[in-house]
Amino acid sequence: MTDILNYTKSEEIFSAAQELMPGGVSSPVRAFKSVGGQPIVFDRVKGPFAWDIDGNRYIDYIGSWGPAICGHAHPEVITALHEAIEKGTSFGAPCVLENKLAEMVIDAVPSVEMVRFVNSGTEACMAVLRLMRAFTGRDKVIKFDGCYHGHADMFLVKAGSGVATLGLPDSPGVPRTTTANTLTAPYNDLEAVKKLFSENPDAISGVILEPIVGNAGFITPEPGFLEGLRELTTENGSLLVFDEVMTGFRISYGGAQEKFGVTPDLTTLGKVIGGGLPVGAYGGKKEIMSMVAPAGPVYQAGTLSGNPLAMTAGIKTLELLKQEGTYDKLDSLTSRLIEGIIQSAENNGIAINGGSVSAMFGFFLCDGPVRNFNEAKTNDAELFGKLHREMLRRGIYLAPSPFEAGFTSLAHSEEEIDKTIEAFDESFNEIKK
């Protein structure tokens, strides 16, 4: 494949950015700290491709970190947004589009009987934690090592995503009193969860988790794990919360809860439901959601929540995803991709394990299996950095961290998958030397 070597404009712009913004970025993982090399400054995106400011084209497997499941700048989404923006960018008042997207979410997601829109996944998780505590009258919450639920103080305990990427301890500036009620357990370890319930009787409001971990790499639930959490929370009078900001509408139309047949009490959403615009949501049983203001006493608000542009993009995206054969195509393409990646590594004598579920995939450069965050950290970080740089030179844009899942879209074709596997063949051959 043709090597990309010219990053002159990206270098200039990123250098200037470091004088203007902390680290030169608006979100830490974009700085390429864990992989080295030159952060790329994008100019435009379309379909499965991204172009940088120097004119280099990449096959993109980040997809704006998950929202672009239909491909970047899908023409139907763009047309709908053009029509919507003529009416104004934000109303700060009720909007019929909120009703329509709410109906679509409620119809699709098994646990959701009522939904509240916010502006990000972090907001959704902050609000859902407050709601859990209010509904149960309990303060403690269980989260899992490596699972990421946004950057709110109470979740920055053994967190994934950028916290894991940068190898940071629990963040400075977060008082111990804030996280004193946050309990942690290894993902896929039911016994550890049982122990926490035993040690904290009648004190745990609920358990929150990514049903498929996407922010500590790509880690799937062991058989019986999600079912076991459902049983444990019910037995202990606690709530089960699925953070489906990443998996919602990505691994099936009804998310992970539909895919695995386990229904939580509450769900957080984001990414896909905004069609590429800032959005978040949380929802669940009416009995619980009726506690949210102004219907109930649990306060939460937002200036741009439910804005017409995000609602428009979300509605059109879900309409596209609901078409027949959508997830069969995503399953097939992504399976082909990860199988090719694994085969390429094995052909070059490089330890690897990985997998995919529909339009979400990931791999670790280590002996497997990887069932939790501690095992994920056995990934060969130095080798992954070399791989990332080699793939970038060949026009393949992967997440610049081993602790982030990858994403395919409906815009990817077999041609892009084949070119990507070819690039992996060449890159693995290069880094094994």
Curated annotation (Swiss-Prot):
BP terms from Gene Ontology: chlorophyll biosynthetic process; protoporphyrinogen IX biosynthetic process
E.C. numbers: 5.4.3.8
Pathway entry: Porphyrin-containing compound metabolism; protoporphyrin-IX biosynthesis; 5-aminolevulinate from L-glutamyl-tRNA(Glu): step 2/2; Porphyrin-containing compound metabolism; chlorophyll biosynthesis
Catalytic activity annotation: (S)-4-amino-5-oxopentanoate = 5-aminolevulinate
GO terms for MF: glutamate-1-semialdehyde 2,1-aminomutase activity; pyridoxal phosphate binding; transaminase activity
Localisation: Cytoplasm
Keyword field: Chlorophyll biosynthesis, Cytoplasm, Isomerase, Porphyrin biosynthesis, Pyridoxal phosphate
A Pfam family per the record: Aminotran_3
Domain of life: Bacteria
UniProt record similarity statement: Belongs to the class-III pyridoxal-phosphate-dependent aminotransferase family. HemL subfamily.
Protein name: Glutamate-1-semialdehyde 2,1-aminomutase
Source organism per UniProt: Prochlorococcus marinus (strain MIT 9301)
Gene that encodes the chain: hemL
